[in-house]
């Protein structure tokens, strides 16, 4: 097979779930429902975090950023998936594919860094409660949020730039969107150890944050065990447990997809794993934080109560 022409006229075919035509309608209905729930849930968290004064804290400031990321993250792939499931045109231009890879990696990398920042916030709240307001100053919170976005986009820029320099053979992507591991399956040859450099970039943005978060929660667990008050323990476990569950969902799927060798990556399995972290996880995050968090539930019931009275 010859080297694929990656000029502006080149393009790709997204196979998606065309291998299971009988399931496409079922996929379409369920994904549309999940996407609608994701939009509502994450938008609600952003709105509550901004309007309720009780939620004007570092924790909810970062949570609103996470919700905005999840909105962008799922919107970068799901609308195209719905179009592909509903219609016959499964093509995407080379420029559109590269843009999708860049945006998806940028948002995912930003979320990876932001989850570390949120773990640091929980560490400061539990392990340094007397100095929490001094440590998590609004200026520092803004700086950490900006650093998360800048770091995520820089990492994506490096990986996407390296990917574009590699020769491709073929134009058929066995996926429902342009994702890095599937893209690498089309690489004809690795010149100059580019794949190794890309793996290092992925490891930096996935493995390093994972280790930092595990270290933070080891310190948090040690501090919680020293607390004598049962109420204080439950409160710490509630706020930290929500974040830890989100972390497990995010990094579990990220490690499976991005840190395994190219030769052992299964495109068929990868599609279903991708459904999990592009649709299911962004949908579950608002539910996890609202159902396990008294402040967020209180703010939500307050808004619903006003709506009932007004109605």
UniProtKB/Swiss-Prot annotation:
Residue ranges that the UniProt entry lists as topological domain Extracellular: 1-25, 79-99, 155-197, 257-270
Membrane-side (Cytoplasmic) residue stretches: 47-57, 121-133, 219-235, 292-311
Coiled-coil ranges (or none): none
Keywords: Cell membrane, Disulfide bond, G-protein coupled receptor, Glycoprotein, Membrane, Olfaction, Receptor, Sensory transduction, Transducer, Transmembrane, Transmembrane helix
Disulfide pattern: 97-188
One Gene Ontology term, aspect cellular component: plasma membrane
Function as written in the Swiss-Prot or TrEMBL entry: Odorant receptor.
Listed name of the protein: Olfactory receptor 2Y1B
The organism of origin for this protein: Mus musculus
């Amino acid at each position: 097979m010859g080297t694929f022409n990656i000029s502006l006229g080149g393009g790709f075919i997204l196979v998606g779930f065309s291998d299971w035509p009988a399931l496409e309608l079922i996929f379409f209905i369920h994904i549309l429902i999940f996407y609608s729930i994701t939009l509502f849930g994450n938008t609600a968290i952003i709105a509550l975090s901004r309007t309720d004064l009780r939620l004007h804290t570092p924790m909810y400031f970062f949570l609103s950023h996470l919700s905005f990321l999840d909105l962008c993250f799922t919107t970068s792939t799901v609308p195209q998936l719905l179009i592909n499931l509903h219609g016959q045109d499964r093509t995407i231009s080379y420029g559109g594919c590269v843009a999708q890879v860049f945006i998806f990696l940028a948002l995912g990398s930003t979320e990876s860094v932001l989850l570390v920042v949120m773990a640091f916030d929980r560490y400061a709240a539990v392990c340094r409660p007397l100095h929490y307001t001094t440590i998590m100053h609004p200026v520092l919170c803004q700086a950490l949020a900006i650093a998360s976005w800048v770091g995520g986009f820089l990492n994506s820029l490096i990986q996407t730039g390296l990917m574009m320099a590699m020769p491709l053979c073929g134009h058929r992507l066995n996926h429902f969107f342009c994702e890095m591991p599937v893209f690498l399956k089309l690489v004809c040859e690795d010149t100059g150890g580019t794949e190794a450099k890309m793996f290092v970039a992925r490891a930096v943005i996935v493995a390093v944050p994972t280790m930092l978060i595990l270290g933070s929660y080891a310190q948090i667990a040690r501090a919680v065990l020293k607390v004598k008050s049962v109420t204080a323990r439950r409160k710490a476990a509630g706020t930290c447990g929500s974040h830890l569950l989100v972390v497990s969902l995010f990094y579990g799927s990220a490690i499976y997809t991005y840190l395994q060798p190219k030769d052992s990556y299964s495109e068929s399995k990868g599609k279903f794993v991708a459904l999990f972290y592009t649709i299911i996880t962004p949908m579950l995050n608002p539910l996890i934080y609202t159902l396990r968090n008294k402040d967020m539930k209180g703010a939500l019931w307050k808004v619903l109560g006003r709506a009932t009275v007004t109605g």
